[in-house]
């Protein structure tokens, strides 16, 4: 078609006035139909293969386009060579590989289980018996602990860690493997229905010991998950259940973790105790815990214990270190006489003479009666006879106090309780575990120097005739 145009017109509107003659006007332009050449006809009749297969194909291509663009963007970001050959076919994941990946995922999640189990360091034997159902179900700490240990057994690439986790799962707690304490309805539930307080206390002590080793395992698992080089860990042989009569337990890795935890919580205040007793009975972590306690932390820790509050992280570490120290200590052969003063009431206020009571917190006493008098004020002053106390005078920054520290919940028998002329309650206590040969029937009351009377150090206080009749010198 040949078109002759007048460039003056700016708007073109096509209309046909005579279809037969092929003549028409387009605005001010005149159009005339002419014969089409053979080459043009062949070009117009040429057919090409279709790029799509209808509407669905075009819609599919449009939907796929964004994903193709994302793939290209990722390839560019990662530096994929665009000149590479056709993409490789996707390799199917074998069942073995899938199982391995699932084990690795469970192993990584074990850290969360260990974190939940940390609260087991703070519960008592009574709580263990009363709350076992909640501790061993759902996300309870006992259930979480056992699940985490199982994940290490099946997922860790380090044989040492797998052996350690296996040994912990088999560790007897009150004669039943720890693994069974993570569920309800079995032997543990049956045991707890009639377990006496002594058994619950023993079970909790064994669990606390196991938790010390769990802390070391947790650190090793964290290192493996992070891809760090393998660290040495306590093997299953070192943490195997103790047979009857055995007493040696390898606690070095747990002690290291405890020491690092105390340093993290208390900084230089804890570090000052490092190396204080290089060849002594107690480890660095235990010395740190005892030192921190005597250096002011006793107030916060004992208050939380007496009010049955959950211990914070620092208090829990100190409590753990002191507990392991008392487990190591052995009673002295000689009976030790110490003194204790309190400004107000104490755990023995309501304990009658001849009866046994205990303080749920740690019990600080001194060889020096003046220290007890300074602490006593108008409250109470007690004279205590015992053999299980730890002498912390070489550890404490207040070494001149000559402190003898008794473990929490140490049973004491009240031999005597009376008020002096100033209204101060004066008591005589002895460890309930003392035998008859070392107790009060063998001369314990033959010369007790309980306190100072108003008349001075050399004048016996005679106002209470009961004390005089018992042979007690309250001077």
Swiss-Prot record:
Annotated S-S bridges: none
Site (Arginine finger): 143
Record EC number: 2.4.2.-
One Gene Ontology MF term: GTPase activator activity
GO cellular component, one term: extracellular region
Bacterial Rho-GAP domain: residues covered: 93-226
Major subcellular site: secreted
Matches recorded under InterPro entries: ADP-ribosyltransferase (IPR003540), ADP-ribosyltransferase_ARG (IPR050999), YopE-like (IPR003537), YopE_GAP_dom (IPR014773), YopE_GAP_dom_sf (IPR037168)
Catalytic residue positions: 340, 364, 403
Note: Although the gene exists in strain ATCC 33658, it is not expressed.
Main function: Directly involved in the toxicity for RTG-2 (rainbow trout gonad) fish cells.
Protein name as it appears in the record: ADP-ribosyltransferase toxin AexT
Organism of this sequence: Aeromonas salmonicida
């Amino acid at each position: 078609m040949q078109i002759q145009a007048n460039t003056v017109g700016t708007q073109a509107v096509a209309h046909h006035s005579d279809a037969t003659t092929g003549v028409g006007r387009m605005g001010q332009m005149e159009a005339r139909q002419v014969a089409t050449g053979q080459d043009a006809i062949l070009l117009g009749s040429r057919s090409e293969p279709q790029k799509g297969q209808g509407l669905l194909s075009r819609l599919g291509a449009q939907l796929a386009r964004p994903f193709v663009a994302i793939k290209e963007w990722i390839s560019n970001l990662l530096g994929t060579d665009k000149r590479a050959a056709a993409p490789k076919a996707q390799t199917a994941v074998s069942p073995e590989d899938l199982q391995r990946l699932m084990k690795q995922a469970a192993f990584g999640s074990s850290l969360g289980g260990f974190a939940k189990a940390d609260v087991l360091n703070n519960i008592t034997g009574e709580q263990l018996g009363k709350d076992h159902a909640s501790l061993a179900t759902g996300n309870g700490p006992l259930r979480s602990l056992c699940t985490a240990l199982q994940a290490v057994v099946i997922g860790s690439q380090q044989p040492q860690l797998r052996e350690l986790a296996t040994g912990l799962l088999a560790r007897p707690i009150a004669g039943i493997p720890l693994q069974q304490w993570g569920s309800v309805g079995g032997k543990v539930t049956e045991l707890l229905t009639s377990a006496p307080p002594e058994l619950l206390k023993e079970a909790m002590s064994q669990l606390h010991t196991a938790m010390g080793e769990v802390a070391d395992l947790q650190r090793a698992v964290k290192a493996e998950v992070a891809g760090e080089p393998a660290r040495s860990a306590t093997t299953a042989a070192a943490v195997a259940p103790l047979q009857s009569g055995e007493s040696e337990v390898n606690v070095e890795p747990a002690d290291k973790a405890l020491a690092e935890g105390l340093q993290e919580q208390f900084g230089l205040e804890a570090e000052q105790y490092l190396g204080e007793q290089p060849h002594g009975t107690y480890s660095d972590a235990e010395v740190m815990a005892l030192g921190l306690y005597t250096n002011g932390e006793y107030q916060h820790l004992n208050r939380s214990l007496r009010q049955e509050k959950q211990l914070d992280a620092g208090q829990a570490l100190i409590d753990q270190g002191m507990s392991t120290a008392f487990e190591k200590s052995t009673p002295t052969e000689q009976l030790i006489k110490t003194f204790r003063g309190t400004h107000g009431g104490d755990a023995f206020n309501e304990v009658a003479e001849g009866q046994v009571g205990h303080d749920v917190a740690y019990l600080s006493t001194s060889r020096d009666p003046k220290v007890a008098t300074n602490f006593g004020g108008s409250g109470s002053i007690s004279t205590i006879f015992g053999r299980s106390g730890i002498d912390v005078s070489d550890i404490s920054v207040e070494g001149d106090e000559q402190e003898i520290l008794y473990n929490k919940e140490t049973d004491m028998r009240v031999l005597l309780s009376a008020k002096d002329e100033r209204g101060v309650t004066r008591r005589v206590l002895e460890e309930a575990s003392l035998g008859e040969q070392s107790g009060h029937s063998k001369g314990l009351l033959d010369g007790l120097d309980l306190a100072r009377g108003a008349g001075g150090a050399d004048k016996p206080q005679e106002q209470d005739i009961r004390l005089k009749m018992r042979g007690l010198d309250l001077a």
